[in-house]
């Protein structure tokens, strides 16, 4: 971070170079499990480090960016265009909206993870909010599994990456507390 202006929601930071997105690496057939593990560990640590923390909730409790950039353009649009599944989509929205558990990136996908040396740099936090981080887990798993349809020759390896990502996330996240919180809703 070079500078920030909190009042006007502005900041400047150094460019990340040289780096290529994990998505680009995946599409090129570079199916490195270390990237999946790192992505999962980072997400799990974010969840654990912000779990039901009132300071994070106060700072990131506004879910309007997530609603404007994810819930409305994707999920409510799906519900409007596909009436046969509309109720299930609206039920899911009603389930996830009130949950305030931990920091949630809102776009935890390989396109927002830059591979740099042995690590990843995570970018694009415009949807971040204090909500239900299971969204991030599902979002990334969805990306990894769907690439198996796009690249059937790598489907098994991509599904293995998804399992590696999930295991690393759950190992770092407060999974038992999470299960109790989800069951209580």
Set out the residue ranges of the language-model regions.
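Active-site catalytic-loop/activation-segment of kinase and kinase-like phosphoryl-transfer enzymes
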Residues: 45-95
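Active-site acidic catalytic loop and adjacent metal/ATP-binding pocket
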Residues: 90-135
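Feature marks short, surface-exposed loop/turn motifs that line or immediately flank catalytic pockets
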Residues: 19-20, 129, 148
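Alpha-helical elements of Rossmann-like donor-binding domains used by nucleotide-donor carbohydrate transfer enzymes
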Residues: 38-45, 103, 139, 164, ...
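ATP-binding pocket architecture of kinase catalytic cores
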Residues: 1-54
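All-alpha amphipathic helical-bundle segments outside canonical DNA-binding/catalytic cores
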Residues: 174-185
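Soluble or luminal CAZymes and related metallo-dependent hydrolases
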Residues: 31-38, 81-84, 157-161
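Active-site activation/catalytic loop segments of kinase-like enzymes and analogous catalytic loops
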Residues: 135-174
């Amino acid at each position: 971070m070079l500078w920030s202006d909190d009042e006007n929601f502005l900041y400047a930071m150094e460019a990340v170079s040289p780096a290529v997105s994990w998505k680009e690496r995946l599409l090129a057939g570079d199916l490195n499990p270390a990237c999946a593990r790192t992505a999962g560990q980072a997400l799990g640590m974010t969840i654990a480090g912000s779990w039901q923390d009132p300071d994070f909730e106060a700072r990131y409790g506004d879910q309007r960016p997530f609603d404007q950039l994810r819930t409305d353009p994707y999920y409510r649009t799906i519900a409007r265009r596909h009436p046969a599944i509309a109720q299930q989509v609206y039920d899911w929205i009603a389930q996830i909206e009130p949950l305030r558990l931990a920091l949630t990136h809102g776009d935890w996908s390989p396109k927002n993870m830059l591979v740099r040396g042995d690590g990843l740099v995570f970018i694009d936090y415009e949807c971040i909010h204090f909500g239900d981080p299971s969204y991030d887990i599902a979002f990334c798993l969805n990306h990894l599994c769907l690439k198996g349809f796009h690249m059937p020759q790598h489907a098994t390896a991509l599904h293995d990456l998804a399992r590696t990502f999930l295991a690393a996330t759950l190992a770092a996240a407060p999974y038992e507390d999470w299960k109790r919180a989800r069951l209580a809703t």
